[in-house]
């Protein structure tokens, strides 16, 4: 969420910056609400001053033995008017808050301007795509040849965009997640966290998925079981399946003041992620690239504002190192203003090479959200007895497990349909060096 004081003082510049993101800021709505707010605020202050003055007159009149009934009646009327004005003021504040919750973050000044992915900027590449001396298969053909990826049965169980992984491929998927967790906790200084996969709406508002992207979420309604449950008007508890572990990890510091000496906080979690993929009809309908349920190892850093861009570069490096250890070619893309996520001020995408598609595909997205999420979550830090300040939050995939599996199946395939296990994963696979029939 943007700082409303910044909006009030620099509206034109902010409107221009948001337009670069493709967001048309409702200037007239904001100015109308601001005008009403100022008017009612002035009225409230005037009524409060008059009531205070009248209250003093009562004391003086009583000392002089005068009748105070008329003044008492005036105070009562002013009290009613004041209550009405306060209710109106609260209503306007709520509308302003709702408007703010719909506004995306401001792009950092280093972000290139662009309308869509065509405006993204390639930063660097690592590794050279392998030249195969046979016709490469995609991961679906490889998995089905091995009998270890089953979309048909998954569709019977759940519907489209689900899969069953079996045998060696299922074990490879598990090995990847374990390898990533070990690397991030043992080498990169992250603390592993096991998080709930169901979260309340406050969490999703904090990280920016709500209210704007509710259609992308899977929601669950159940009967209240505990007095701490968030019960709606029907007596039901509304929860959401997490679209990413960023949501529970970042919300660890919601409504919290973190002592300065504890920063940075670095969290990692391996979770399933659930997305409805609304608006993705017809995109990546084949294979594991775009599923309703997929696993991801998520990295979150909570930092001092002056350290967040240094942290972003290190976070990207942590995700890169996984691909380097797996010897998978990739490239780093700096996203343009029109292709960034709602909460991000700056985002790097890491794209891995998929030989069957002869292109690079996103496998990680690493973002600095600056104070945008922290303001929504009221996540702050404090040095000693100083006034609390907003934290900066960062997140990134380290990595998407399913897409890493896809990259290994395709980049490590052999002519006979088998798949070689990357050397670094062989200990996680119990010494298995190849998946074959």
Swiss-Prot record:
GO terms for biological process: selenocysteine biosynthetic process; seryl-tRNA aminoacylation. Pathway: Aminoacyl-tRNA biosynthesis; selenocysteinyl-tRNA(Sec) biosynthesis; L-seryl-tRNA(Sec) from L-serine and tRNA(Sec): step 1/1. It is an enzyme of class 6 (ligase). CDD domains: SerRS_core. Belongs to the class-II aminoacyl-tRNA synthetase family. Type-1 seryl-tRNA synthetase subfamily. Consists of two distinct domains, a catalytic core and a N-terminal extension that is involved in tRNA binding. The keyword Protein biosynthesis applies. It comes from Nitrosomonas eutropha (strain DSM 101675 / C91 / Nm57). The keyword Glycosyltransferase does not apply. Catalyzes the attachment of serine to tRNA(Ser). Is also able to aminoacylate tRNA(Sec) with serine, to form the misacylated tRNA L-seryl-tRNA(Sec), which will be further converted into selenocysteinyl-tRNA(Sec). This is Serine--tRNA ligase. It is found in: Cytoplasm. Its main location: cytoplasm. GO terms for molecular function: ATP binding; serine-tRNA ligase activity. L-serine binds at residues 244-246, 298, 397.
